[in-house]
């Protein structure tokens, strides 16, 4: 199953205002989870103790939070996948279910390789030495510890833009939430794309 596939090396896209930028609006001082054309991992809690979806700054200037249904679709599920009949007190389990779920494409690949493991490909081998950085991949079978030069992606899949998932279910942040985030980022002194805070200040507002 392992080392039977090798996709193209992933190139990290540049974070600028021409692309959707996902971030944790509940954070700001120590890190905001910048994600280009996507959202950072879903978290049930936050530094503010608020269970909430991350936010996306779109190239048109809109600052929006995806709905639960959108996050289900981002994971490859149908909208409503987390619908539950039992009422739960306090925080509902839906966000945790979506955040902890293995995405559908990954599960499909794992299942396909469990069913049909495939043959090990010919990889460049590198020695693993003590007190040296470990390689990204390797094994310890027969000849001892061996590193291999392998891609961090077993297969190459064209990922859709998060803009394709944007619909009327997305919600705007309140003035208070947006202003609070801007202030925390200013205080934290984090490295952010040029014009990011200015774009947030110019965004349409939703009073709370």
Regions found by a protein language model. Give the residues of each.
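Acidic, Ser/Thr-rich low-complexity intrinsically disordered segments
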Residues: 124-204
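Class I S-adenosyl-L-methionine
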Residues: 1-65, 71-72, 199-201, 205-207
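Active-site-adjacent bridging/hinge elements
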Residues: 75-88
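Rossmann-like AdoMet/SAM-dependent catalytic core
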Residues: 38, 45, 67-75, 93-94, ...
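A helicase ATPase "motif cassette" and its flanking acidic/Ser/Thr-rich regulatory loops
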Residues: 103
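Short, hydrophobic alpha-helical segments
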Residues: 111-122
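Acidic-aromatic/histidine active-site loop/patch
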Residues: 107
């Amino acid at each position: 199953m392992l080392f039977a596939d090798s996709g193209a090396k992933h190139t990290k896209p540049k974070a600028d205002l021409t692309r959707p930028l996902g971030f944790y609006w509940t954070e700001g001082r120590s890190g905001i989870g910048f994600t280009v054309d996507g959202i950072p991992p879903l978290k049930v809690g936050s530094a503010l103790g608020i269970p909430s979806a991350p936010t996306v700054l779109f190239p048109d200037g809109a600052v929006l939070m995806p709905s639960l249904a959108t996050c289900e679709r981002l994971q490859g599920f149908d909208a409503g996948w987390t619908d539950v009949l039992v009422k739960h007190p306090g925080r509902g389990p839906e966000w945790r279910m979506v955040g902890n779920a293995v995405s559908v494409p990954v599960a499909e690949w794992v299942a396909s390789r469990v069913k049909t493991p495939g043959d090990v490909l010919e990889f460049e081998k590198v020695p693993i030495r003590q007190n040296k950085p470990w390689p990204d991949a390797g094994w310890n079978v027969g000849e001892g510890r061996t590193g291999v030069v392998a891609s961090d992606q077993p297969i190459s899949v064209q990922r859709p833009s998060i803009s394709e998932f944007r619909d009327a279910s997305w919600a705007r942040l309140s003035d208070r939430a947006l202003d609070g985030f801007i202030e925390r980022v200013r205080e934290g002194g984090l490295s952010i794309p040029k014009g990011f805070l200015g774009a947030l200040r110019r965004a349409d507002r939703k009073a709370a």
